[in-house]
Amino acid sequence: MAWRSSGSTNSELIDNLRNNRVFASQRAYDAMKSVDRGDFAPRAPYEDAPQRIGYNATVSAPHMHAAALDYLQNHLVAGAKALDVGSGSGYLTVCMAMMVGRNGTVVGIEHMPQLVELSEKNIRKHHSEQLERGNVIIIEGDGRQGFAEKAPYNAIHVGAASKGVPKALTDQLAEGGRMMIPVEQVDGNQVFMQIDKINGKIEQKIVEHVIYVPLTSREEQWNRN
């Protein structure tokens, strides 16, 4: 039903996502309602489809953002720390920050310096206080390595498909924490995986099939056709 969720405004888009049962969390709904996708996607921001933002990067479709926030809702709580790998436009980073509140921190890590600059510009349009308070921190770096300086994280979101689950990211997951990551399987298909750390052990669960751009090095992304 996600493909029927497009709207003419941000509010209509998010209402359609909920009406089509793409997500159930009231907190995720409130977060997405409060962050206008139009600030982050230059073309057709309220269409339920991925949008190109330059530098061979995309902002994921709204239904995937809704699903990710839904799966992470019990870990994106007041005061929590979260990591958004491949933060791109900054959209989901801000949504996550809305859910962890004033005392929480969300680190967005992005390896394209132009997108780091773009995301901060996007955030300052209507959510500059998130940057000023330190609720949102945008870092230039290789997201596959996470950001150990602020670890451990209660929630980790990865916005591109990895060939396997990076150990650096599971190492930075807090006890009781959860990571949502698209993973490319040996047959080339991709699955959205829920990774939980319970009693120091990693538990993995496939929740749905997905299509994402690959999680690569900066050089590979530059050269991708």
Swiss-Prot record:
Species per Swiss-Prot/TrEMBL record: Caenorhabditis elegans
InterPro entries, per database record: PCMT, SAM-dependent_MTases_sf
Biological classification of the source: Eukaryota, Metazoa, Ecdysozoa, Nematoda, Chromadorea
Predominant cellular place of this UniProt entry's protein: cytoplasm
Family: Belongs to the methyltransferase superfamily. L-isoaspartyl/D-aspartyl protein methyltransferase family.
Role description: Initiates the repair of damaged proteins by catalyzing methyl esterification of L-isoaspartyl and D-aspartyl residues produced by spontaneous isomerization and racemization of L-aspartyl and L-asparaginyl residues in aging peptides and proteins.
PANTHER family registered for this protein in UniProt: PROTEIN-L-ISOASPARTATE O-METHYLTRANSFERASE, PROTEIN-L-ISOASPARTATE(D-ASPARTATE) O-METHYLTRANSFERASE
UniProt record, GO biological process: methylation; multicellular organismal response to stress; protein modification process; regulation of autophagy; response to starvation
Keyword terms, alphabetized: Cytoplasm, Methyltransferase, S-adenosyl-L-methionine, Transferase
Entry's EC annotation: 2.1.1.77
Cell compartments where the protein resides: Cytoplasm, Cytosol
CDD domains xrefs: AdoMet_MTases
Pfam families (alphabetical): PCMT (PF01135)
Name of the protein this chain belongs to: Protein-L-isoaspartate O-methyltransferase
Gene Ontology cellular-component annotations: axon; cytoplasm; cytosol; neuronal cell body
Catalyzed reactions: [protein]-L-isoaspartate + S-adenosyl-L-methionine = [protein]-L-isoaspartate alpha-methyl ester + S-adenosyl-L-homocysteine
PROSITE patterns membership: PCMT
Active site per database record: S60
Subunit structure and binding partners: Monomer.
Annotated positions binding S-adenosyl-L-homocysteine: A57, T58, V59, S60, H65, S89, E110, H111, D142, G143, T216, Q221
GO molecular function, one term: protein-L-isoaspartate (D-aspartate) O-methyltransferase activity
